[in-house]
């Protein structure tokens, strides 16, 4: 979360989160292993300043983006916030109804003040984060297309070995020894929320349909999320 929440801590703090040069030397020279580090934060894609901060500090970075059906992403996000104690509204429907009221002014303040950290923008942006096309355009204005690997989350989790192989090839790391069985890969956050109300899902299919169409046209890929 350095490039979104903890940027004010400075580059020294960020570097301290990674293995030291001594550890790298030991891995490469003594253990004869390739050494590469990375990090992940879903909020980076949505945060208005994360792209340009990363472009400034890591202009050659390779970017792996996982995109999930925005309806399922929003629903999962809501229950994640409930479980984490951040969300107090009792239903998903109430939360998405209140979203713009909660985060609208927060977004404005973020755009006015680069150093502002918004709790609401981070935790309650259920539908807004699913408008992927607008977010990707910001990133792709700063980085060339060849620095991105964009994967469909549903495909990645259905066949993690194949997905991981794509990632390793993208970052030029050998993929020898990868296990083919899905069961070999640990899954986190496996608790499934209750089934979404059918009327709510229908409404969100209609809401996201134009944004998904723009995304498909922009990337030249149809993810089949309109259901």
Predicted segments with their positions:
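The conserved 3'-phosphoadenosine-5'-phosphosulfate
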Residues: 137-214, 220-227
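ATP-dependent NMP and nucleoside kinases share a basic, alpha-helical "lid"
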Residues: 47-65, 133, 137-140
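Surface-exposed cleft-lining segments at the edges of enzyme active sites
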Residues: 41-42, 112-128, 188-200
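PAPS-dependent sulfotransferase catalytic core
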Residues: 1-42, 57, 61, 66, ...
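Acidic-and-aromatic substrate-binding clefts and catalytic sites of carbohydrate-active enzymes
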Residues: 3-11, 44-48, 127, 155-159
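Structural motif corresponding to alpha-helix initiation and N-cap regions
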Residues: 8-11, 48, 133, 198-201, ...
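Short, glycine/charged-enriched secondary-structure capping and boundary segments
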Residues: 51-54, 78-82, 164-166
